Amino acid sequence: METLFEVAETTAKAPAKTDQLYSNLEEYKKIINTNPKTKWVKANPYANNALYLPIGIVEELLNKVFPFWQVEQHGEPKIIGNSVVISVTLKVWHPILNQWLSYAGVGAVPIEVQQGAHPTDFTKINAKALHKNVPAAMSFAVNNAAKKIGKLFGSHLNRKDSEI
């Protein structure tokens, strides 16, 4: 049986069956309320070194903890100010509760314009900006939704006081 701390050690292998990770609600709560491994956590130099989990880690954790999960995008990407904004619902199948659980998430990424251009001068958008900014906003939205599941998914990474 894989322990909580070995959950992502097998990311190169096939996903573990969730019944190997938890068999009751208390075990599930223990898993999702454990801090992520330090080696998974990265600092974002563009956001005052805010800590985050890369989307690849989040997706592997979703694969390990839940038998099924899916992302539903709400409408089309929106442009607000100079950013691409995407809203999603992350749905995970909880095998103990025998139901889908839903978590809302929003992601935004500034649209890249040519150096020196005003951020909202859309005549100066870099050629491939939206090609990479839209998927990045989607990744941030999924990551934001997953944080709501628990500490394992990064919910407490940037909190000063997280103990009750």
Show where each model-derived region lies:
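Positively charged, aromatic-enriched nucleic acid-contacting surfaces
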Residues: V58-I164
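N-terminal, Lys/Arg- and Ser/Thr-rich interaction peptides
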Residues: M1-I55
